[in-house]
């Protein structure tokens, strides 16, 4: 089984071919292809290549499946004994991708 570790949106993801993944929002239309050049690690069965900091010439190709928003995260701030409460919420945008290829 081959897999890779990529960096996008300030986070690291372990990906394998055929996987679906929700990442931070990318400004790419649905159905288009996107390439990730920042590959930290590539593993093909027995052989593992670790970059310093990235693997030279390695890329991961993915197809954008959809764009959307995560479930709402609710935040409550309050001051004790002051009868004051503030309720807020946040929904983060995401891009869902399907990994179509790992090239090392």
From Swiss-Prot:
It comes from the Bacteria. One of its GO terms (biological process) is translation. NCBIfam families: L21. One of its GO terms (cellular component) is ribosome. It holds the Pfam family Ribosomal_L21p. The keyword Repressor does not apply. GO terms for molecular function: rRNA binding; structural constituent of ribosome. This is Large ribosomal subunit protein bL21. Belongs to the bacterial ribosomal protein bL21 family. This protein binds to 23S rRNA in the presence of protein L20. HAMAP family: Ribosomal_bL21.
